[in-house]
Amino acid sequence: MNLNELRDNEGSRYRKKRLGRGIGSGKGKTSGRGVKGQKAREGVSLNGFEGGQLPLYRRMPKRGFVNIFRKEYAPVNLGAISKAIESGKLDKAATVNEEALRKAGLVNGSKLAGVRLLAHGELSHGVTIEVAGASAAALAAVEKAGGTVKVLETKKEAQADA
């Protein structure tokens, strides 16, 4: 048997039945929806309803919660900073902080707690970076390139120290 000899089984494919086209069509008048009621109406499907069987969302246990105090940090990779310096969007002599990263287009979004520095990519310039957080690998990579990273304290940490 070859690929060009493959065929569907006889009778396995049907033409779709057009609905509401007379009694002789087999799907006329009510189009297989029965008579009246909620399910006969247009646009109705009961999400999560499984015909009286206990639905999945009730069978599963409740777990977890949403932390309303969760802080969202914008990730910025070293490779992106390096590329921005080479293209002239960032000045390697100046301190690279959140404001500079926003102007360069590397960070956007208003509800962020700050910037987190990550180590993806190579940093070819010794720069001073001020961020809210940084990975250990990113800190090592910046220091290896001859730069420094200052991890800023949050307001809560500053109050705890005082």
Curated annotation (Swiss-Prot):
Keywords: Ribonucleoprotein, Ribosomal protein, RNA-binding, rRNA-binding. The keyword Cytoplasm does not apply. Residues 1-39 are annotated as: Disordered. Residues 1-13 have a biased composition (Basic and acidic residues). One of its GO terms (biological process) is translation. GO terms for molecular function: rRNA binding; structural constituent of ribosome. One of its GO terms (cellular component) is cytosolic large ribosomal subunit. Gene3D superfamilies: 3.100.10.10. Pfam families: Ribosomal_L27A (PF00828). The keyword Cell membrane does not apply. Residues 21-35 have a biased composition (Gly residues). Part of the 50S ribosomal subunit. Binds to the 23S rRNA. Belongs to the universal ribosomal protein uL15 family. This is Large ribosomal subunit protein uL15. It comes from Gluconobacter oxydans (strain 621H). The lineage of its organism: Bacteria, Pseudomonadati, Pseudomonadota, Alphaproteobacteria, Acetobacterales. The gene is rplO.
